[in-house]
Amino acid sequence: GLEFIESIGIDRINARVRSLIEYLANGLLAIKHDNGNELVKMFGPKGFEHRGGNIIINFFDPEGNMIPYASIEQMTNSRSISIRSGCFCNPGIDEINYCISNEEMTQYFMSRDHGGHEDIIQFLGKMRGAIRISVGLATVRKDVDRMLEFAQTLKNRHF
């Protein structure tokens, strides 16, 4: 494993991964619904200099409603496209992405003894979670093109 990586060179691997993730992100961000609304919102830095081999996104219908990440994951899985969805076991990032305040979180947790993902969505009136797409050493351009082709199937669709 390590000898293989050393034989290629970490700088070459990083350059290739950056190229693939930039191609993917730019391709996704270029897709618009016929009414001009964006299909994808990407979280994190806009540039690629300090971005690793993944992007965190959500898909939206033509009216701007977020398409549930679980639906996206089911659709991609049926096409043998591997993504990760949810809150990524990363406390705080989802709250930042959706502008959920400390006060809202305190109010939620102080008002119940238990609850789950759907319960907090209903309480806050805000969607939670996102989709993470990762590329790496084994990713080829065809893999990225398949994800972009999938994204095109969401254009102008209502869920």
Protein language model features and the residues they cover:
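Pyridoxal 5′-phosphate
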Residues: 1-159
